[in-house]
Amino acid sequence: MKIKTDEITSVLKQEILNYKKDLGVDEVGTVLEIGDGIARVYGLKNVMSGEMVEFQNGIFGQAFNLEDNSVGVVVYGDYLAIQEGFTVKRTSRILEVPVGPELLGRVVNPLGEPLDGKGPINAKLTRPVESPAPGIAMRQPVGEPMQTGIKAIDAMIPIGRGQRELIIGDRGTGKTSIALDTIINQKGTGVICVYVAIGQKASTVASTVEMLRNKGALEYTIVVSATAAEPAPLQYIAPYSGCSMAEYFMYNEKKATLVVYDDLSKQAVAYRQMSLLLRRPPGREAYPGDVFYLHSRLLERAAKLDDKYGAGSLTALPIIETQEGEVSAYIPTNVISITDGQIYLQSNLFASGNRPAVDVGISVSRVGSAAQIKAMKQVAGKMKLELAQFRDLEAFAQLGTELDPATQAQLDRGNRIVQMLKQPVSSPFPVEEQVVEIFAVTRGFMDKIPVPKVQQYGKFLLTRIKEQHSEVLEAIRKEKKISDEEKLGEVLSAIAEEFLRKH
């Protein structure tokens, strides 16, 4: 067999031409110990705090503690797959998540990876998970309502676009329901919603997603889920991820956004676990010293941007779970002091059938009537005061003393307001319907209706008005005020008489 030298030389020449010196220089370290989502790594002398690092099996972590001889790394993924002796290399990047309209209608984990089995998310952009909050010059005062569709809240504890309103109460008092009703009520308003579930049961998240889908709310919502089965680092990072996803719509698309953090108590517990495993010194209730900053840097990212920056907004509804109504515990007081008001839900009100179980006495909105349309200001101004007086009188009336007619009338009016404010779950009311009902009860057009029939009458009233006087609702919707109170009064009197004749 003859060797063709010219062929061999041509192949060799081609190989020499194509030869590239590919020398990658990575700064690497070695895993000393791993457990509970925390790795101690030797080496990585130049790693920066908060920098992402990559383990040899492709799992990512973040450098948290920089010590003399080692680096404390939190692992974002399955830490059981990492072994002692694995190499770890720097990436020179910070943690970023995919953002953009591709995420709408999807369920993702805090790293932006899909959990709903609908295939990959081909997002074109990413955003850092930790972004600086907008400064004073970038903001404008909150003045546009964020309607929740819940009568008790829209009338007495109004929420504005760009506000941070805490929902606080014991477990099982309907905190999540209020937040989800608010998301459902944004249908058709162009508001983008992000629901962040932290440390919840996977079954609960699944039923929440199903409910949003059935109500047609999933198409404008992103669900970020870090269930109780996920490692603590993922639960800790979840709210920041959700916030970054919403910030894209606020800054880039100039839209109004709503983010629900459900709930921040579990995030604080996850952060406490991480901090103790990293051997950071514990403080009150064993939380680390920077647990206030944990929540303040998250909630300060909510804002109503100035017109120069596109006038987008990010409204935050953080949820905190209390133990036995203890609002003065460490985390609740921290978050109360950061937010612009709180909606306090009481278990005894919930148990007695007053749902939503909002305690109007200690719930406040520090934005106040700036976040209400004029029609709501016209009718709801007196209601909070009347309800507070009713609660005082109610305690007094239980003593069984004889009451003068004026006090009795006030008690009856209060009872009617309480009945009118009751509302079934996931059935938010448009603001014009709320205005009509509240006008009817506060101006005395329900005084002849027996208290047990007030809710039934409320349904009857709205049905009649939609059928026969839809122009009344249309006028309130367009003008945002009640222009003809006399006419509305006549309509309500006629409907009340018709109801009393029939029932």
From Swiss-Prot:
CDD domains: ATP-synt_F1_alpha_C, ATP-synt_F1_alpha_N, F1-ATPase_alpha_CD. ATP binds at residues 169-176. Transmembrane segments: none annotated. Disulfide bonds: none annotated. It is found in: Cell inner membrane. The keyword ATP-binding applies. It comes from the Bacteria. It is an enzyme of class 7 (translocase). One of its GO terms (molecular function) is proton-transporting ATP synthase activity, rotational mechanism. Pfam families: ATP-synt_ab (PF00006), ATP-synt_ab_C (PF00306), ATP-synt_ab_N (PF02874). Its EC number is 7.1.2.2. Keywords: ATP synthesis, ATP-binding, Cell inner membrane, Cell membrane, CF(1), Hydrogen ion transport, Ion transport, Membrane, Nucleotide-binding, Translocase, Transport. The record marks 363 as: Required for activity. It is a peripheral membrane protein. One of its GO terms (cellular component) is proton-transporting ATP synthase complex. The keyword Mitochondrion does not apply. NCBIfam families: atpA (TIGR00962), PRK13343.1 (NF009884). Produces ATP from ADP in the presence of a proton gradient across the membrane. The alpha chain is a regulatory subunit. F-type ATPases have 2 components, CF(1) - the catalytic core - and CF(0) - the membrane proton channel. CF(1) has five subunits: alpha(3), beta(3), gamma(1), delta(1), epsilon(1). CF(0) has three main subunits: a(1), b(2) and c(9-12). The alpha and beta chains form an alternating ring which encloses part of the gamma chain. CF(1) is attached to CF(0) by a central stalk formed by the gamma and epsilon chains, while a peripheral stalk is formed by the delta and b chains. Belongs to the ATPase alpha/beta chains family. This is ATP synthase subunit alpha. It comes from Leptospira borgpetersenii serovar Hardjo-bovis (strain JB197). The lineage of its organism: Bacteria, Pseudomonadati, Spirochaetota, Spirochaetia, Leptospirales.
